[in-house]
Amino acid sequence: MEFGLSWVFLVAILKGVQCEVQLVESGGGVVRPGGSLRLSCAASGFTFDDYGMSWVRQAPGKGLEWVSGINWNGGSTGYADSVKGRFTISRDNAKNSLYLQMNSLRAEDTALYHCAR
């Protein structure tokens, strides 16, 4: 019986830690076609440099689309064909932050952008 109680307690603790993960995006705005924006994502509640990170977006009335990804140390990146050559993903592990530099913006880039672990 003691073992069962300990196990339930451990699960409760782990679930509590998981709920504290936060990813807060900033830097969006309204720009003209051809303009630039830099998005930031501040991460907390987990060991940031243990994880690869991604940016995804959702255009009005459409589903989620993967935009770009980066491995734990920034040594490897990938991009959707639709943004290749225009967007640049980067990260600063010392600041627990993820970035997306978006250049040569087009009307079709209009979307809600989210960072994802």
UniProtKB/Swiss-Prot annotation:
Stored SMART domains: IGv (SM00406)
Cystine residue pairs: 41-115
InterPro entries, sorted: Ig-like_dom, Ig-like_dom_sf, Ig-like_fold, Ig_V-set, IgHV
Entries under SUPFAM superfamilies matching the protein: Immunoglobulin
Region (Complementarity-determining-2), start-end ranges: 70-77
Gene3D superfamilies xref list: Immunoglobulins
Molecular functions per Gene Ontology: antigen binding
Spans annotated as Complementarity-determining-3: 116-117
Official protein name in the record: Immunoglobulin heavy variable 3-20
Taxon lineage: Eukaryota, Metazoa, Chordata, Craniata, Vertebrata
